[in-house]
Amino acid sequence: MMEETTDNTGTISSQKNVAASGHNHHHRYKYISNYGVGRRFLFFASCFGFYAFVAATYAWFVFPPHIGRTDHVSSSSLGCREDNEGSWSIGVFYGDSPFSLKPIETRNVWRNESGAWPVTNPVITCASFTNSGLPSNFLADPFLYVQGDTLYLFFETKSPITMQGDIGAAKSIDKGATWEPLGIALDEAWHLSFPFVFNYNGEIYMMPESNEIGQLNLYRAVNFPLSWKLEKVILKKPLVDSTIVHHEGIYWLIGSDHTGFGAKKNGQLEIWYSSSPLGTWKPHKKNPIYNGKRSIGARNGGRAFLYDGSLYRVGQDCGENYGKRIRVSKIEVLSKEEYREVEVPFSLEASRKGKNSWNGVRQHHFDVKQLSSGEFIGLVDGDRVTSGDLFHRVILGYASLAAAISVVILLGFLLGVVNCIVPSTWCMNYYAGKRTDALLNLETAGLFSEKLRRIGSRLNRVPPFLRGFVKPNSSMGKFTLGVIVILGLLLTCVGVRYIYGGSGAVEPYPFKGHLSQFTLATMTYDARLWNLKMYVKRYSRCPSVKEIVVIWNKGPPPDLSELDSAVPVRIRVQKQNSLNNRFEIDPLIKTRAVLELDDDIMMPCDDIEKGFRVWREHPERLVGFYPRFVDQTMTYSAEKFARSHKGYNMILTGAAFMDVRFAFDMYQSDKAKLGRVFVDEQFNCEDILLNFLYANASGSGKAVEYVRPSLVTIDTSKFSGVAISGNTNQHYRKRSKCLRRFSDLYGSLVDRRWEFGGRKDGWDL
């Protein structure tokens, strides 16, 4: 009995030792495993934190939150938000016929009260409607109703609250140059669009699209233009973009039904007829008239119109994208048994500015009327983005961020922080409870089949293979790691740009509801032709540039075919190489504003649009981007001197807006003659002279105004050997001499000083 007890005791003791050893072994591996998890967590937290910091910094510089859009929709407003359907707005065109229409800016219509010299399209936008207290994301489908010399406009306005279309109304008493938003004419519980308005038996009717409820409604004006009553349901079909035309004693209803079996969306068209627009409607014998390609213009794009005895139907080409362009077809046969039409040439003046133009990407609706004067007016909606652009950008943005995350994981593989893709215990049962450096540390033994374990084992060979291939400790390996880090940063910034950066379009800044245009002028000569080519290609795409005038001072001028321009370019060859040519009176300039911009300055179009917007507030001022401060020493200094004195009293005209008549007449006056002579002697300082002339003309008022350019502005004169400012010291000495000379002639600027940061929008910080 004693021996048996002893043996049992020894066995029990041995078992306890093994258990204790196993217990310590378990805790040791648990500690190591926790260490691995902590290391991985620290690595990924550091990487993602660094990338997030870079993304936030990039967003702050590129989309600065402290700088707003003056006289646009504020960031707190509900209106003008990005919409996946687009950013439609409405422009006006004039001509002697519906086939010779030109945009309003070609008529050179000026409006002093809104600083529009000239007025330019679009004439009514989501901003003008939203700022009147009627939030809207976009305006589309314009229809005109003419009462004498008063024009009423009805259109779809996309509500940012309900995210559905309502029918808005506006009025013009100056032939469409200015529009007063009146309000919402029709608001139902369902989506409304395409407000076809017409007169019948002394009553005004509206037939908007309401296909969402499966029927076509007809409304009658109770108190025109904002009060309407449902008259009747004229057709129990979900027709879209329907219009009525009276032809040979019969009323014809033309629209599309995309819900029918086999119907081709945006490629289908039907016709119905009746003795009255109130019904009853009967289907055409050949229905559907069209049911095929979306590019043929089957879907209506506006009201059918009569011109020169012929009837025309407006359609929209949806081949490349919804509402890509307008097509017009001449109706040759329209009877109860037959319908035949043939497409005719039709084009509205298209911009080459792409997204930077309000209608540069698509136009899908056209309505034309003849005014009492005999001329024709056409209303057109246009968009700078394609349908679905917002969704597309968001997808690309998050895909870029996902790729950046993948780059971080790849770094983890290469640096040995992550040793395998799946936990080793998913691959082999006997690793249960041991340390793992897997990307996904979810250890569960016995849950996976042998095939999945083999797949996991193969995947886990990838990290060691990559480390062996790249060799992170070698020089080439370190270079590769650096490239991968930079790639991750680029992907992060690209993702932020896609998600928060908008469509990439540069939009102009309206002032009191109007947009306008300016002439861009630059002075150059043959040795700087390469500068000029870049200059024209870049700035001709800015939204508000109407024309580029090249002041050619020396050498044979280039052929216009050498310049890639989206706007007309005019080369003015000078007889004498003089800096005074910059401000020579030019009667061919049609805009009031001129931007004098040197050909060696490269800045974003958005900066230029801001400067133009500021100048429109104060056209009597010289508005520019490069401030200088002149003190009692009369020593010319760079911008940092003005910053150190927290103010400026001069703006360089190498990048400045001015009133072409006021500035050029003043510069060429007899009073400025001695100054011009000194400019020719020094071959310098024409911009300084103009500042002195502005100061004299302004009296005690503010003569110049600064607009801060972005950080990406580049002065290419630093890389050129032909700039007059190449030798900085000599250049500054000449300009100091000019300051003293012009002070003697025109008085000092010393007692003038305007501080930075005076604008609420932050554009002059």
Curated annotation (Swiss-Prot):
One of its GO terms (biological process) is response to abscisic acid. Pfam families: GINT1_N, Glyco_transf_64. Disruption phenotype: Loss of the GlcN(Ac) glycosylinositol phosphorylceramides (GIPCs) leading to a reduced sensitivity to abiotic stress (e.g. abscisic acid and salt) on seed germination. Reduced HexNAc-GIPC content. Slightly larger seeds with more seed storage lipids and proteins and larger seed coat cells. Mn(2+) binds at D600. The chain crosses the membrane at residues 43-63, 394-414, 476-496. It comes from the Eukaryota. Disulfide bonds join C685-C738. Its EC number is 2.7.1.227. It is found in: Membrane. Pathway: Sphingolipid metabolism. GO terms for cellular component: membrane. SUPFAM superfamilies: Arabinanase/levansucrase/invertase, Nucleotide-diphospho-sugar transferases. InterPro entries: Exostosin (IPR004263), GINT1_N (IPR056442), Glyco_hydro_beta-prop_sf (IPR023296), GT64_dom (IPR015338), Nucleotide-diphossugar_trans (IPR029044). It is a multi-pass membrane protein. The active site is at D687. Belongs to the glycosyltransferase 64 family. This is Glucosamine inositolphosphorylceramide transferase 1. It comes from Arabidopsis thaliana (Mouse-ear cress).
